[in-house]
Amino acid sequence: MVLDLDLFRVDKGGDPALIRESQEKRFKDPGLVDQLVKADSEWRRCRFRADNLNKLKNLCSKTIGEKMKKKEPVGNDESIPEDVLNLDDLTADTLTNLKVSQIKKVRLLVDEAILKCDAERIKLEAERFESLREIGNLLHPSVPISDDEDADNKVERIWGDCTVRKKYSHVDLVVMVDGFEGEKGAVVAGSRGYFLKGVLVFLEQALIQFALRTLASRGYTPIYTPFFMRKEVMQEVAQLSQFDEELYKVIGKGSEKSDDNSYEEKYLIATSEQPIAALHRDEWLRPEDLPIKYAGLSTCFRQEVGSHGRDTRGIFRVHQFEKIEQFVYSSPHDNKSWEMFEEMIATAEEFYQSLGIPYHIVNIVSGSLNHAASKKLDLEAWFPGSGAFRELVSCSNCTDYQARRLRIRYGQTKKMMDKVEFVHMLNATMCATTRTICAILENYQTEKGILVPEKLKEFMPPGLQELIPFVKAAPIDQEPSKKQKKQHEGSKKKGAARDVALESQLQNMEVTDA
């Protein structure tokens, strides 16, 4: 995931100042741009010298061959003249005046210089890449510039009644329908572990079916992805911070051969976007085949480092969940990817409108975008039991930022003298099932249970197509209120104080008094 290097090169039509400005708007280090430009300039100088040295080496070999053909004297191990030691100034005429033995010595010096130059070039390439991979995509002009997501995300539009309030939150409702085992899940799987069971398993499967059929009717190809990826491929689709904060690493045998003791690192996927992005790795995509649209289905695994204390109860923020994803490969021309961007968020909106979930669309501020996204819109559903908007969908246009490192090129083959173009890649959540279940539970709660959304009824089993009944009491109703807790604690303290006073009084009393 990187920008085009030519964007940093003024002589190639690039504009480093534009990238520096984009970095500043992202509230990231603009100094990375200067570091990259410096390393790239030195790398290009080094490569130019290496090219000249290789030409000089070929010239040495050619001159030796001509002299041997003419049967000129080889020489008696004469030393190289001082003026010849400066390899950068050597010419064919200079070599012609040397003996064969001298030219061979010059060629050895050239070999040493090439090795030294190659080592320097590799070092500069590494320095340049370190900066390049931490520089974000160029921002779309419509992105709000701010580093405060809570205050400055721009609300683009609202659908449905986002003011209604209801009694219970999803944390209580998953228990009331007996569809969730949290404590036992944590014992088995650790923090945020859970068992989804009973009616909520059916509801989840109904959502998956409805989402896949909706996307299939719009030309998306359903695709069930691998759950883990090789490290070298994951590095091409995920930014560096994700390896520490989001991704789970697994280590397994590197081969199925019993005598092979090697081990290989792999990473569990955080979203089907990652394996689908790599699906056409190292390919040329024909213009007539675009757009290519996939409806990804996968289990997703996320560490959620940094979210300690947030949404610790229930199934809204968990380490493992199912998700249906929109993923599109688009033409880089004629604004096609931005037209597709609007189409994808519209598809997500239609899905949640058909489920009757109120929401608003927000334009995410520049400081909260990941490196790849040029722009991101989130669909945040209204949760009437929690009294808050919560994110269900993220829709991003990554332009050619991902495709470049994956080498997914636009066209059939490179044309002579033409620059290689890369496809644009876009992704958008369709349905993260656990979060959507939470939204349905809060919006469709009644006194007796959860009404089933009209569009999901055909996918639910008999007896659960109209209403999912409450079968357990709400945990919040079982817990004493804060006022009751305070009164209870106060009475305990008063009782303890009375006991201490009485004990003291008894110790000070005389026997006759007793």
Swiss-Prot record:
Entry's EC annotation: 6.1.1.11
Recorded GO MF terms: ATP binding; enzyme binding; molecular adaptor activity; protein homodimerization activity; RNA polymerase II cis-regulatory region sequence-specific DNA binding; selenocysteine-tRNA ligase activity; serine-tRNA ligase activity; tRNA binding
Biased composition, class Basic and acidic residues, residue ranges: 479-501
Gene3D superfamilies hit by this protein: Bira Bifunctional Protein, Domain 2 (3.30.930.10), Serine-tRNA synthetase, tRNA binding domain (1.10.287.40)
Chief location of this protein within or outside the cell: cytoplasm
N6-acetyllysine: residues carrying this PTM: K323
Binding annotation for L-serine: T271, R302, E325, N427
N-terminal signal peptide: none
Keywords annotated in UniProt: Acetylation, Aminoacyl-tRNA synthetase, ATP-binding, Cytoplasm, DNA-binding, Ligase, Nucleotide-binding, Nucleus, Phosphoprotein, Protein biosynthesis
Assigned GO CC terms: cytoplasm; cytosol; nucleus
Annotated residues for binding of ATP: R302, Q303, E304, V318, H319, Q320, F321, E391, L392, V393, S394
Residues with PTM N-acetylmethionine: M1
GO biological process: cytoplasmic translation; negative regulation of angiogenesis; negative regulation of transcription by RNA polymerase II; negative regulation of vascular endothelial growth factor production; selenocysteine incorporation; seryl-tRNA aminoacylation; tRNA modification
SUPFAM superfamilies the UniProt entry points to: Class II aaRS and biotin synthetases (SSF55681), tRNA-binding arm (SSF46589)
A Pfam cross-reference name: tRNA-synt_2b
Site (Important for serine binding): T429
Region (Disordered): 475-514
PROSITE patterns hit by this protein: AA_TRNA_LIGASE_II
Record comment regarding domains: Consists of two distinct domains, a catalytic core and a N-terminal extension that is involved in tRNA binding.
Protein family membership: Belongs to the class-II aminoacyl-tRNA synthetase family. Type-1 seryl-tRNA synthetase subfamily.
Subunit structure: Homodimer. The tRNA molecule may bind across the dimer. Interacts with SIRT2. Interacts with METTL6; interaction is required for the tRNA N(3)-methylcytidine methyltransferase activity of METTL6.
Role played: Catalyzes the attachment of serine to tRNA(Ser) in a two-step reaction: serine is first activated by ATP to form Ser-AMP and then transferred to the acceptor end of tRNA(Ser). Is probably also able to aminoacylate tRNA(Sec) with serine, to form the misacylated tRNA L-seryl-tRNA(Sec), which will be further converted into selenocysteinyl-tRNA(Sec). In the nucleus, binds to the VEGFA core promoter and prevents MYC binding and transcriptional activation by MYC. Recruits SIRT2 to the VEGFA promoter, promoting deacetylation of histone H4 at 'Lys-16' (H4K16).
Name this polypeptide is given: Serine--tRNA ligase, cytoplasmic
Lineage, broadest ranks: Eukaryota, Metazoa, Chordata, Craniata, Vertebrata
Gene behind the chain: SARS1
